[in-house]
Amino acid sequence: SYQPDLDGAADPGEIVWTWVPYEEDASQGKDRPVLVVARAGDGDLLGLMLSSQEHRRDDENWLPVGSGPWDREGRDSFVRLDRVLEVPEHGIRREGAVMPADRFERVAAELRSGYGWN
């Protein structure tokens, strides 16, 4: 559930920066923004990566979430719904921003309806 609080610990609704390995080669990756959607039972964060690549707009696994302070150029962003990342709290490089509640709820609704989250 949505509960952002910029207190140093990441919470659902916050966008944080962390290392995300590439799917095709997990030994490589890049630092990128991730929307925290929940906590796993072991305390790790569950998150969805963001992208500002415009070609994501036509991909059904990417949901447009608009622009926000997580992109310093103010570009529209997209959240990837079909790849959930498990991120240890110590793996977060920095807290970035809070996603507005209405946009977070849209992401949550898509996860529930299309991906079986509850």
Feature locations, PLM:
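Short alpha-helix capping/helix-loop boundary micro-motifs
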Residues: 1-5, 22
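Compact nucleic-acid interaction/catalytic patches
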Residues: 26-31, 36-69
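Short N-terminal helix-initiation segments at or just after the protein's N-terminus
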Residues: 24-29, 114-116
